[in-house]
Each structure stands twice: as structure tokens, then as C-alpha cells.
Amino acid sequence: SALFPALKAMGEGCGAKLFYLTARNTTQAAAEDAVARLRAAQPGLALRSVTLTAKEKACLHPDAEGHPACLPEVCPFANGYYDRRKDALAALLDGSGSFSRAALADTARQFSVCPFELGLDLSEWCDVVIGDYNYLFDPVVHLKRFFDAAGDWLFLIDEAHNLPDRARAMYSAQFAKSSLSEAKRALGKGKSSLKTALTKADKVFLAARKACTQAAPRIGAESVSYTHLRAHE
């Protein structure tokens, strides 16, 4: 019900691109279906939509878990991507105009390109971009190609009441004490300025754990901070 007036406003020059943002896959599918219905109701309607999927979910690498970093030297879909993306984009743009996760994956396999990067590049050619909240609100993974500068964009935010919890997660940093221990072990034996700094940081974690443990009886176990829990590692 919200898509139609938003697209109508775009047709009247009130926006160049519509971003439909939701945290739920089912709602993304519903948005895809709504766009498809509008396109079917107006056979001559030139309307393209793409659904963006998180990189780890879209990845086609057969050993993705073994290669958490997206590196051309270990991924055949990333290696030479820019040499092959033009043909992949051309094949998609000659198609139906509705680009789901499955459609991107099929084309990515055909042309041996990264489906995640293909979706990002394709979004520049689409009228409607469907995806998660973080593509707009997360300071680390937001769509820089669109939001690093002002643009004539329209936004539909599904279930916006969920944004405060998501925003807290997006703007919060986490660091585990176990990371310090692993770094110190990696440095091996002997002294170094880096190992000294890691030792000092380790002491800060231990002090925080002690302070939280002492405060826990007063504030209740449910209120103990996440920092306290991670400091036990």
C-alpha cells in the first residue's frame, strides 16, 4: 500500500530512486511481489527493482567460511570481476527488470562474478532498491555510492519502531579479551612495544571484569554489561 504512492510520486518527479528498507526477509519478498504486480498491471511500465542480500549470504565461494575476507586471490568470483561485470549487467538489464537474490546468483554463476558486487552495481540502474536497514543507517556498510553525498532519494522504512535496537547495535563496538590473548601468543616470546601495550590493555579488561563483578549483586545479574561478559573470555 505504501509502494504505489511512493512510485507515483517518483513518476511525478519527486524522487529519482526509492529505497525500501526492512529487517525481515519475508517483507523483502513481499516488496518484490508488490513491484512485480505493479509491473504486470502496467505492461509498458519501465520499472526495475533489485533486492540486496548480505555478502555472507550471497557468497557463492565453495569454501566461504574458510575465507572470511573477500579477496580476489582466493575467490574466482572476485578475481577479474571488473573484466566480466559489463557482460553480466547487460544480461540482467535485458531481462525482466525484477532482480531477486536468486536471479543475481544465477547470473553471477553464468558469468563467474561476485553476486554481492553485481547487486550493488545493478542498483545504480534500478528504480527500486530493496534491502536491510543497514544499507542506509549503518556507518560502516551503508551504500556509499548513494549516501556519501546528497541525492534525490525516497525511503520507505518498514517497521521503523525496530530501528532503535538496530541502531544501538550498529553504533556499538565490541572487543573480546580473547583477542588480546591471541595477539600476544602470535607475537611469540620476547619483548616488544606492541606486546607491552597488549599487556596493559589486558589489565584494563581484568579491572573492568572485577568492577562489574563487584557491582553485579547491587544492580542485578540481568543488568551486567556485555563488556563484563566478554571480559571473562
What are these regions (language model features)?
Residues T227-E233:
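Conserved small/polar residues in nucleotide/adenosyl-binding loops
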Residues C14-V129, F137, T199, L206, ...:
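A substrate-engagement module of RecA-like helicase motors
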Residues A6, D33-R37, E65-H67, L143-F146, ...:
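Short, glycine/charged-enriched secondary-structure capping and boundary segments
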Residues F116-D121, Y133-S223:
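Signature of the SF2 helicase/ATPase Hel1-core->accessory helical subdomain module
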Residues A2-G13:
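Walker A/P-loop NTP-binding motif
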Residues G11-G13, A41, A149, A160:
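Secondary-structure transition/capping motifs at alpha-helix termini
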